[in-house]
């Protein structure tokens, strides 16, 4: 049996209007990307990318989107994303664009990148904050994310099947 290889595009919906993110739906976003691929690459691009294309993850609050497509045609999807200029949902049109953050072979690599990306964003916010209350809240978030990462790393080591460090032979 042959495994189908996919690529995952981790994108961020960037918009000045905060209502744009709150009205996001995976069905609408998937249709928008498919229509844009058809407009940019024609019927060949639409047919090639429709096989295996899916919106795997969508967070309406942060605007993070994870798109899955076949490995052979991920460049077609990737090259069509800059042509998305607005999101139309429920009769409203919101100007926005998709910023591609990472292209990965697994969902896990995209998750690891997203954790690092969010940590960098928190550190940038920490440098730019003016109020002491904001500064404490951001420092608390950074500390919490570091503690969660250490716990998950500890769990991965304990799940390695009992192959901890061996004692050196003398």
UniProtKB/Swiss-Prot annotation:
Q: Which residues carry this modification: Phosphoserine?
A: 158, 160
The subcellular location is:
Nucleus, Nucleolus
Matching entries from InterPro entries are given as:
Pop5/Rpp14/Rnp2-like (IPR002759), RNase_P/MRP_POP5 (IPR016819), Rnp2-like_sf (IPR038085)
Predominant subcellular localization, coarse grouping:
nucleus
Q: Alphabetically list the UniProt keywords.
A: Nucleus, Phosphoprotein, rRNA processing, tRNA processing
Name the Gene3D superfamilies for this protein. Answer: Ribonuclease P, Pop5 subunit
- GO MF annotations, alphabetized: ribonuclease P activity; ribonuclease P RNA binding
GO biological process per UniProt: rRNA processing; tRNA 5'-leader removal
Q: Where is this region: Disordered?
A: 149-170
Cellular component GO terms held in the UniProt record: multimeric ribonuclease P complex; nucleolus; ribonuclease MRP complex
Q: Which domain of life is it from?
A: Eukaryota
- Additional free-text comment from the UniProt record: The last C-terminal 19 amino acids are not required for complex association and RNase activity.
Question: Subunit composition?
Answer: Component of nuclear RNase P and RNase MRP ribonucleoproteins. RNase P consists of a catalytic RNA moiety and 10 different protein chains; POP1, POP4, POP5, POP7, RPP14, RPP21, RPP25, RPP30, RPP38 and RPP40. Within the RNase P complex, POP1, POP7 and RPP25 form the 'finger' subcomplex, POP5, RPP14, RPP40 and homodimeric RPP30 form the 'palm' subcomplex, and RPP21, POP4 and RPP38 form the 'wrist' subcomplex. All subunits of the RNase P complex interact with the catalytic RNA. Several subunits of RNase P are also part of the RNase MRP complex.
User: To which protein family does this belong?
Assistant: Belongs to the eukaryotic/archaeal RNase P protein component 2 family.
* Function in brief: Component of ribonuclease P, a protein complex that generates mature tRNA molecules by cleaving their 5'-ends. Also a component of the MRP ribonuclease complex, which cleaves pre-rRNA sequences.
What's the protein here called?
Answer: Ribonuclease P/MRP protein subunit POP5
Gene that encodes it? POP5
């Amino acid at each position: 049996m042959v495994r189908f290889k996919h690529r995952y595009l981790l994108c961020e919906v960037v918009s000045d209007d905060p209502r744009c993110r709150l009205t996001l739906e995976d069905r609408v976003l998937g249709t928008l990307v498919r229509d844009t691929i058809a407009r940019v690459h024609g019927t060949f691009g639409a047919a090639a990318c429709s096989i295996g294309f899916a919106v795997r993850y969508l967070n309406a609050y942060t605007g993070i989107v994870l798109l899955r497509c076949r490995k052979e045609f991920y460049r077609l999807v990737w090259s069509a994303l800059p042509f998305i200029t607005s999101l139309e949902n429920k009769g409203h049109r919101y100007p926005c664009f998709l910023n591609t953050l990472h292209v990965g072979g697994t969902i896990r690599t995209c998750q690891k990148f997203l954790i690092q990306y969010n940590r960098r964003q928190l550190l940038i916010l920490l440098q730019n904050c003016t109020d002491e209350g904001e500064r404490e809240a951001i420092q608390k978030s950074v500390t919490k994310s570091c503690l969660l990462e250490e716990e998950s790393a500890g769990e991965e080591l304990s799940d390695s099947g009992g192959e901890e460090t061996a004692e050196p032979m003398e």
